[in-house]
A protein has these predicted regions:
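Gram-negative and organellar
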Residues: 19-22, 29-44, 48-51, 58-470
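Gram-negative bacterial Sec-dependent N-terminal signal peptides
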Residues: 2-17
Length: 470
């Protein structure tokens, strides 16, 4: 009788047992570090446990789940997604796989992969709080709040404290806000180095959205008045618009803002129409049309108006990078037309561990050529180009209020004459009592505007929007 194999197995058993103990010890140490709010140390323990070869499937699953949770805490969302995918592969039953899928959906939502997150949790989120929270986050980003209402009604509210309770409350308020009729008021003011003042006041009412088959629709009306004052004369622009938001299936969205306008005895049609096709999280196409008066006193006096047509794309070569090119054609009723384009490259902000801050970056460029350049009526050189690089900072004051800042510098060239340019902006977004919303923007830029541009030019602006559900 050959006794070599049983003897070999007996010799190997202590080594296997020792390795199992090491993996279990690493997992326990990682869980203890998480409970003690030490995610960096926890990640090291869970990574060490996962690196052990030949570990049991349940240990591999536990280590991967812990590694994903640690990475989420530290803001390393791509690493968290990889860890939760590993946990999915090691899951031993449907409940374990759903827990891994919920963690993966949280990591995907944090990277703005909303469609993938929604598809992941929608099959099982009904009646479960954690996956419902991630489904609501994805639905909010996609504008699919009407689809998510049933999930919210079926979920059991979690305790108010902690991440889950806070997110549930905020997302519930966001859903109710999105599905209710809304009133809106907005105010804007700008002043530039030429003494041109532009004051804007507007109000809007939007009906509650409704769905018919694959069509989701929302309609409303808006009224606006704008005063343009250059210190010598003052002009008023008034308009009334029909507002429309249409969602067709999963991929098509149309936004409308169309209606009549007037300035004194001059009557015209104005507004915007925009179509967007977004088949996935990483690519989309868009097209738009805009018609508006040229916003300077002299241009309004001469009844100058333009039509602008644009096509664009959005591409995500990586989780943190967004590339947005646009081409446009702008036709003025004085016979001038422009061919131009713009490009924005965005680096999604990185969360700074153990703080409420995140830092990202932005590159923006614009170029156009006018076939009939002119001076004195509106900014209209033959050739214009500009490019700026900037830093973006985001600070979460608390879960309900967020501050965003941009500081960019670059250069512009107007008919061969170059000059340095800069842009500084601060925005505040948050919630008001009664589930209202506030958006405040302050900015200063030396880049050319519709009225003027060049060395020494600058423009200061402030915009405020307040919305309330009814």
């Amino acid at each position: 009788m050959n006794t070599r194999w049983p003897l070999l197995a007996l010799l190997l058993m202590p080594a296997v047992h020792a390795q199992t103990n090491v993996v279990a010890d690493d997992i326990r140490a990682g869980r203890a570090a998480l409970a003690d709010s030490r995610p960096a140390q926890a990640r090291e323990w869970f990574a060490a446990a996962l690196a052990q070869s030949g570990s049991a499937r349940e240990d591999r699953y536990a280590a991967a789940i812990g590694l994903g949770q640690s990475a989420l805490w530290l803001g390393d969302y791509p690493a968290a997604a990889r860890a939760f995918r590993t946990a999915r592969e090691a899951a031993g039953d449907a409940g374990a796989q759903q827990a891994a899928d919920t963690g993966l959906a949280q990591a995907l939502n944090a990277q703005d992969y909303s469609r993938a997150a929604y598809a992941l949790v929608a099959p099982y989120a009904q009646g479960q709080t954690k996956p419902t929270v991630e489904l609501l986050r994805a639905a909010q980003s996609l504008g699919w709040q009407d689809r998510a209402a049933g999930y919210l009604d079926a979920a059991t509210p979690p305790p108010a404290q902690g991440y889950l309770g806070t997110q549930y409350r905020l997302l519930k308020d966001d859903l109710r806000f999105a599905l209710a009729p809304q009133v809106e008021g907005d105010f804007g003011y700008s002043h530039d180095s030429d003494g041109l003042d532009t004051l804007h006041v507007g109000a809007a009412y939007r009906f509650a959205p409704f769905r018919r088959g694959d069509w989701s629709q929302r309609w409303g009306v808006a009224a606006n008045t704008t005063r343009v004052d250059d210190g010598r004369q003052m002009r008023h622009l008034d308009d009334l618009s029909l507002l429309g938001q249409l969602s067709i299936g999963d991929n098509h969205n149309i936004d409308l803002d169309l209606g009549p306008g007037r300035s004194g005895g001059w009557h015209y049609w104005q507004g915007t129409a925009h179509w967007n096709w977004q088949p996935g999280d990483s690519f989309g196409l868009s097209a738009g049309a805009e018609r508006a008066p040229v916003p300077t006193d002299i241009a309004i006096e001469h009844h100058l108006i333009y039509n602008l047509y644009s096509v664009g794309a959005n591409v995500r070569p990586d989780a943190r990078w967004y590339v947005l090119p646009t081409y446009y054609r702008q036709n003025f009723n004085d016979g001038n037309h422009r061919d131009g384009g713009s490009l924005r490259v965005l680096l999604s902000p990185y969360d700074i561990a153990d703080t409420r801050m995140a830092i990202g970056g932005e590159f923006s460029a614009r170029i156009f050529h006018s076939n009939q350049p002119s001076h004195g009526v509106y900014f209209n050189p033959a050739n214009y180009r500009t490019a700026q690089f900037g830093l973006v900072g985001v600070y979460s004051i608390n879960p309900e209020w967020k501050l965003r800042a941009l500081a960019a510098v670059g250069r512009q060239v107007i008919d061969g004459a170059g000059a340095s340019v800069y842009t500084i902006g601060v925005s505040l977004n948050g919630r008001l009592p009664g589930n209202g919303r506030l958006e405040l923007q302050l900015g200063r830029s030396s880049a050319a505007s519709a009225s003027n541009g060049g060395s020494g030019y600058w423009n200061n602006s402030v915009n405020l929007v307040v919305r309330y559900p009814l």
